[in-house]
Amino acid sequence: LLGIGIGAPSVNEQNQATAHAANLNWNSGLDIINELHEIFSVPVKLTNDANLWVLAHQQFDQTLLSDFFVVTLGTGVGAGICCNGSLLKGREGFAGELGHVIAQNSGRSCSCGRKGCLETYVSANGLIRTVQSLIAQCNNYTGPLLDLSVCNLSAKMIAELAISGDEIATKAFNLTGQILGKALANMVALFNPEIISYSKETVIMEECCLSLPEQFAEIKR
């Protein structure tokens, strides 16, 4: 073993430790580097997981793109940004915290302490919250989602129901795609990328992307 590289959310590049990760049960910064170094006695490096996707593109993608960004979507939302061939980290390494840009003023409460963050709408948990909201608004819905508790709901399950034509699941994905499309269009305006890439950590992105071309076209108009 020559070394260990770790991708994690909410990484402070200055002190090489995780800060408060809103979607993980960590009450304070976790000193992963020293803990692993004591066990394995090899160099340990830590960076944001979305940044590693950028580095992977640069290492293995033969197209040699110099301007692009990668979107990670799971329990949270993140972005790794490459500008002029260089990974954009920011002062402390928190550049690309796409999930915590505001998608809706005074919107849903986020685990980071703010309201209306993008990931409260387009992450896996955000999709589930949208389904719950739609069911509460629809008095005549009689589909299978009525019989499922929050604990038993998953993004994959909602996607399967949307594919089968379930009214609530389909509407939830459409709404999620609209919000995600606007956020990505804003990223395009800011960074002028050659491509947008995404990690397939969850079924959400693949399903939402079906509606993204329409959202981009609407924004351009």
What are these regions (language model features)?
Residues V42, L46-A50, A103-N139:
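Glycine-rich phosphate-binding loop plus the immediately following alpha-helix
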Residues C117-L118, T202-I204:
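Short histidine/acidic/glycine/proline-rich micro-motifs that form metal-
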Residues E119-I195:
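A mobile "lid/hinge" subdomain adjacent to the ATP/sugar-phosphate binding pocket shared
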Residues A8, L73, A124-N125, K200-E201:
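Short secondary-structure boundary segments
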Residues L2-I4, S10-F69, E206-I219:
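Glycine-rich phosphate-binding loop and adjoining helix at the ATP-binding site
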